[in-house]
Amino acid sequence: MNFLKTKTYENLKKAFVSECSARTRYEFVEYGQRMQGLEGLATITDKIAYQEFNHARMLYTMLCQKVKDNPMNNVDICFDIPFRQRWDILDNLQFTAKDEEEEAKFYQNASKVALEEGFKDVSELFENIRQVEIKHKKIFEFLYNGYKNGTLYKSDTKKSYVCPSCGYEMVGTEPEKVCPLCQAKMETFTVLLPKNLAF
């Protein structure tokens, strides 16, 4: 079977471009969060953007391995890419969760197609990325709900909150609104994700 004539080849190309695009969109979102002093949110968004970069890298590597006997100079790719993000924090958290949900659906279908076409390795790659995208969706939903409801920095149990600026440690169900040592705002503190969503 000529790999260049398969749906799996088309899906690999789309997935690569989609992950590159997601990384850049999330970096825009992260930039907006940092500009508004929301370092805790920005740190998590930055980690997810970096993971999207690595998804693109893995897809690119797989694509190169599959076409090594048919070197490519240019790859034609035509499909829709989400273009929802704006400069509103809540909207962007909601949009990124939606993006991740759509990615997970794409990977589920692409994995099935790759397996049907006999590319088990590509199918497994798609499925592994799908699992991460599902987690990303849950993280963005958690951040959205916490930011919207004002519970992002609150916990039912006592936790240790360390100021990222000066290292001052507070123990409680939420950090002080302002660090008593350096006066950094609570929004700069690391957002504590639930254990099932932690990196």
Q: What are these language model-derived features?
A:
Residues 1-199:
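Non-heme di-metal
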